[in-house]
Amino acid sequence: MENNTEDINEVESIETVTTGYEPREPQKEIHKAIKDNRWVTAICHRRMGKTVCAINQLIHSALNCTKESPQLAYIAPTYSQAKRIAWGYLKDYTRPLGGIANESELRVDFLGRRISLYGADSPDALRGIYLDGCVIDEYGDVHPSLFTEVLRPALSDRLGWALFIGTPKGSNHFKELRDFADNPSNEG
């Protein structure tokens, strides 16, 4: 992904001022990709900071969403993984924004916005909601029907975005999605 200095500075200033998050180069590439595309795949090495990046992208998108009552979601393969991996980051990074954490529902409300954590092991919890954006972490460990049957409809009416993020785990539906995204004939 090529980076335009102006775009990088935009991302840095918004993220740094509101949450204290300072993205590293690979994280900046992900933020720029989401700014420029509705669907984004990101294959990340271990310890790259993908969860911190993902949580801060959700916060940034919530803050900049002009629709009424924005709702965004972070989805891990299991509910317990979402809590263990991302819950602390979500609470910490929204605290400066007056975030109110609901421990039993794993959600934070701030400034009329909501970010919730879910597990792909309980897809019914995502049915019937609308989303302005979502992150599907470790997409290779999630059944692909979660996106096609549950998340895409939740994103459709508000033209929400999705970030498919994870670490490489051989040939699976995440690799197929990335290969599809990398093929220039699939643009548009």
Locate predicted features.
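Phosphate/NTP-binding elements of NTP-utilizing enzymes
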Residues: E2-G188
